[in-house]
Structure formats: structure tokens, C-alpha cells
Amino acid sequence: MRCPFCGSDDTQVKDSRPAEDNSAIRRRRICPDCGGRFTTFERVQLRELTVLKKTGRKAPFDRNKLVRSFEIALRKRPVDRDRIERAVSGIVRRLESSGETEISSEQIGLQVLEALKSLDDVAFVRYASVYRDFSHAEDFEQVISEITAKISQDHEPG
């Protein structure tokens, strides 16, 4: 692994342990040339995924972009980083095991919405407003009524 500080190719692993929900290995590394310390993550990649954008353009799947989408929707919300990582890992696992190499951005967006719905209602509405391209207050009202109906249904005695 190349040192991000000095560019040396000779770095040493000082510590390895499972990370997140055991879907990655966290490695602490040190560079003998400059003494720099840094962390890397190693994940299993079942297949190369390509995202098919709405414009028809294709782009390599970027797990970090998926994480950023969650972080933006969940900004200033009381959701642990571990829960975000588990949600992202679950989505990536489902995408990789789907058998498809090209995944539409719409499919990814729907999976993010589904995950956010179970993580945080406010984040769900935030993400939905961008994903579904809300342009009127009524759009927000409709999604909020859907959430309210679901909450009422979940709390019915039975």
C-alpha cells in the first residue's frame, strides 16, 4: 500500500481488525520511511458495478457517494455512524448479489429511500424531496401523510 504522505511503496500493517458490521477489515499502517500512520479498509467486492444514470451516461459505482447521500440526509439527526454503515453495506451487498452489473440510479435511490424510512423519518423526507424532485409544498404533505399513516398503522392495537 502506497503511503499517502510520502508516496513510499513500503508500508507495514501494525493492526488489523474487523470493522463496521464485519463487512470490512480495518488496517492501521505505518510508513517506515516517513513515520506516517494511516488507516485502510479492505472489503469484499463480488462484482464491478456500473451505475446507469437517468441521462443514459454510465459511471462506476462509488460506495463513498452512497455513504455521502446518507450523511447529507441524516445531517444533524440522532443516527449512529454504525447504523449508516450497516445500511450502506446492506444496499451494496444486495446490489452485488443481484446478478446485474449495470444498476440504474433509480434502483439505488429506491433502496436508499427504503433504508432511510427505517432509520429516520426526517432524513427520509429530505432524501425523498431531492430524489422525487419535489417542487411544491403539497409534495411534502403527501409524503408526510404516508409516514403518519404508517406510524398509525404500526401502533394500532392488535
Swiss-Prot record:
Disulfide bridge partners, by residue number: none
Alphabetical keyword list: ATP-binding, DNA-binding, Metal-binding, Nucleotide-binding, Repressor, Transcription, Transcription regulation, Zinc, Zinc-finger
GO MF annotations, alphabetized: ATP binding; DNA binding; zinc ion binding
Cofactor remark from the record: Binds 1 zinc ion.
Sequence ranges assigned to domain ATP-cone in this UniProt record: 49-139
Listed cofactors: Zn(2+)
InterPro entries linked to this entry: ATP-cone_dom, NrdR-like_N, RNR_NrdR-like
Segments forming unnamed zinc fingers: 3-34
Biased composition (Basic and acidic residues): 11-22
Region feature Disordered, mapped onto this chain: 1-22
GO biological process entries: negative regulation of DNA-templated transcription
Name of one Pfam family that matches: ATP-cone
Assigned protein family: Belongs to the NrdR family.
Function: Negatively regulates transcription of bacterial ribonucleotide reductase nrd genes and operons by binding to NrdR-boxes.
PANTHER family noted in UniProt: TRANSCRIPTIONAL REPRESSOR NRDR (PTHR30455:SF2)
Record protein name field: Transcriptional repressor NrdR
The species this protein was found in: Allorhizobium ampelinum (strain ATCC BAA-846 / DSM 112012 / S4)
